[in-house]
Amino acid sequence: MEIICLSDTHKLHRDVRVPDGDMLIYAGDITFFSRRPSVLTDFNDWLGQFPHLYKVVIPGNHDTLLQDEANRRKITNAHLLINSGVEVNGLKIWGTPTTGLTSGAFAVPDDIARTEIWALIPADTDILVTHIPPARILDGTPRTAEHAGCESLRNSYRRIRPQATRFRARS
């Protein structure tokens, strides 16, 4: 199965060239703190034009609109995963938008609370989609040598050992 992954288009999704594949995974930041639900409608229409058999989306920390259930219903051309999973073509996929940030959408600054969220991830998950990286796995920041990943998420990786993972990166 050919899986295409992208993220962080911040309302510029129509400017991105998306290769064909079997599955399209979008790992968050559809918007940039937009308050206009029409942005989600446009994103959903954009998703609908692609031939990928399966499409999976998680929100990111800039997707405050998706904290509202009514706005979540605007995403109909993909499986929208918010601390939830879906099985497609025999693959168990889990998606979580949770971040360790102190503000923004889906922010959970308390490590103990995040650990409880990560505990929801089934051990038999094949593909894990997150908006933040686990600690010390491709988590270097571009401007400093600091690691921005989440230690409790890294511990969950050790428990789950998914076949594949996708967390946000530059698109």
Regions picked out by a protein language model, each given a short descriptive name:
Residues 1-9, 27, 90-99, 126-131:
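Active-site-proximal beta-strand elements of phosphoester/diester hydrolases
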Residues 39, 102, 124-163:
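Active-site-proximal segments of metal-dependent phosphoesterases and phosphodiesterases across multiple
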Residues 38-43, 74-78, 109-115, 143-154:
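Charged helix-capping and loop-helix junction motifs
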Residues 71-112:
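Helix-adjacent hinge/juxtasegments
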Residues 10, 16-18, 107-125, 129-130, ...:
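Active-site-proximal loop/helix segments of hydrolase catalytic cores
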Residues 20, 77, 123-124, 161:
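Alpha-helix C-terminal capping/helix-to-coil transition sites in glycosyltransferase folds
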Residues 6-88:
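Core catalytic region of metal-dependent phosphoesterases/phosphodiesterases
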Residues 10, 31, 61-64, 97-99, ...:
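Catalytic metal-binding/acid-base residues of hydrolase active sites
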